[in-house]
């Protein structure tokens, strides 16, 4: 009987470690919402960026016409001058994901300098996950953000991406509408089942 109880405790520890790992995952932000990464978005990318709060492990999803545009991660100076000659990172597949792997500022411009000069550029400030909650910021009375939680508790639940330019969905897998507990609810159910199996 002691061996079974030790195994159950070990299994519970492994599950809790797995739950802790999933909580560290971030959100997927659709850059530009329904418009995607375009030269003349319906909402300025600067405004879009300021309405959101980005944290380490979040992902930016750039959707654009493959072969007609691209996304370049650049320095702040290159961002300010729309200089496309020395990018830090170049994305060109038309459906690009960029992981925000550390806190600080990131700068993105179109691979077409003329598009950048028209406003197709994005600056993102990434906050540390340790000291800040993960919720959208609103600087103006705009429509409620449409988003979904990946696995950490945070902003209120939403629905699938719509016309709102503040759309966020889980990074992996198809979008589904979570309950008010987000994805922590299933983790709690597993934990309760595991604890009850000990008795």
Curated annotation (Swiss-Prot):
Lineage per the UniProt record: Eukaryota, Viridiplantae, Streptophyta, Embryophyta, Tracheophyta
Disulphide bonds in the chain: 82-116
Name of the protein this chain belongs to: Early nodulin-like protein 3
Positions of GPI-anchor amidated asparagine lipidation: 179
Annotated organism of origin: Arabidopsis thaliana
GO molecular function list: electron transfer activity
Domain of life the protein comes from: Eukaryota
Pfam families per the UniProt record, alphabetical: Cu_bind_like (PF02298)
Keywords: Cell membrane, Disulfide bond, Glycoprotein, GPI-anchor, Lipoprotein, Membrane, Signal
Tissue spec: Confined to flowers.
Glycosylation sites: 57, 83
């Amino acid at each position: 009987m002691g061996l079974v109880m030790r195994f159950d405790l070990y299994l519970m520890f492994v599950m809790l470690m797995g739950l802790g790992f999933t909580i560290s995952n971030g959100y997927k932000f659709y850059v530009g919402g329904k418009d995607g990464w375009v030269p003349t978005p319906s909402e300025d990318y600067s405004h879009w960026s300021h309405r959101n709060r980005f944290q380490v492990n979040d992902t930016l999803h750039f959707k654009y016409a493959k072969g007609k545009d691209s996304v370049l991660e650049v320095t702040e100076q290159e961002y300010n001058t729309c200089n496309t000659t020395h990018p830090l990172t170049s994305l060109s597949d038309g459906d690009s994901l960029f992981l925000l792997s550390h806190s600080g500022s990131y700068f993105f411009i179109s691979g077409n300098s003329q598009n950048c000069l028209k406003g197709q550029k994005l600056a993102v400030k990434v906050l540390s996950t340790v000291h800040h909650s993960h919720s959208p910021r609103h600087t103006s009375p705009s429509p409620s953000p449409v988003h979904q939680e990946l696995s950490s508790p945070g902003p209120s639940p939403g629905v699938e991406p719509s016309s709102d330019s503040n759309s966020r969905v889980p990074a992996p897998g198809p979008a589904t509408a979570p309950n008010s507990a987000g994805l922590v609810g299933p983790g709690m159910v597993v934990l309760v089942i595991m604890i009850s199996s000990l008795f």
